[in-house]
Amino acid sequence: NPEACIQCNQCAFVCSHATIRPFMLSEDEVKAAPSNIKLADTKPKASEYKYTMSVSPLDCMGCGECITVCPVGAIEMVPQESQAEEQPVFDYLVANVGKKPGMPADNTVKGSQFNQPLLEFSGSCAGCAETSYARLITQLFGEHMYISNATGCSSIWGGPAATSPYTVNKDSKKGPAWANSLFEDNAEHGLGMEIGQKVLREQAIASAEKCATSDKASAELKAAFDKFVETKNDTKANTPAAAALVAELEKAAAAGC
């Protein structure tokens, strides 16, 4: 019910399977959306965007957690088959609508739920709190995550043969790196993953430094390398710096550096 909804996003926050998600749409995105989409002005005050909370009826497990947590009773459970026309709306939003400038901060319940979940539609039980926590972590850190999974429920829904509920960000194409050790040593296993990642990164930096400090290196490459090193321990700042360095290294490689 878009009139009753206060847009707190708590329903998406508790969803075990990432099947209910909020979106903010621009004017062009609204025009391109299916005609049956339910929209509302943003709250607590209107903005240039329209708000919608969309559900994937084919993936919803019917646990009712969203109804339980909703503070204003804006969600109603109805038979799945009656909501078939909502699936194209959800699919359109997932494929075409992303975060916008000026959205609530990622470190808030409301703001975090506008981030793409990188854990979705898993085989965990309906209402499983474990996947709710794991999904939230991927929304905050998923593009930079290394997961050393302990053997248990999370290894069953997290890594079933031939499928994976973990995915990649649709823009960056990056997502969690997942592995599971059967020997009840995931702490040691995870430490090994971290050490290995650090060694590989140090080797990559050393190789980039050779190119960036050579006589053939351009001023742009040197600046990009310096920025990368300066921000290497700041994930948010280092992400664009890494992309810029890779672009300059590719140019240098093409020029024979």
Regions found by a protein language model. Name each.
Residues 52, 75, 144-148:
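Structural motif
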Residues 10, 25-27, 31-36, 65, ...:
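Short acidic, glycine/serine/threonine-rich loops at helix termini
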Residues 10-29, 56, 65-83, 132:
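Iron-sulfur cluster-binding cysteine motifs and their immediate structural context
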Residues 11-14, 43-46, 67-69, 136-141, ...:
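A general structural signal for short secondary-structure junctions and capping/turn motifs
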Residues 54, 60-62, 67-68, 136, ...:
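Extended amphipathic secondary-structure runs
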Residues 1-7, 24-62, 80-85, 111-122, ...:
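Ferredoxin-like iron-sulfur electron-transfer modules
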Residues 16-28, 32, 87-102:
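Short secondary-structure boundary segments
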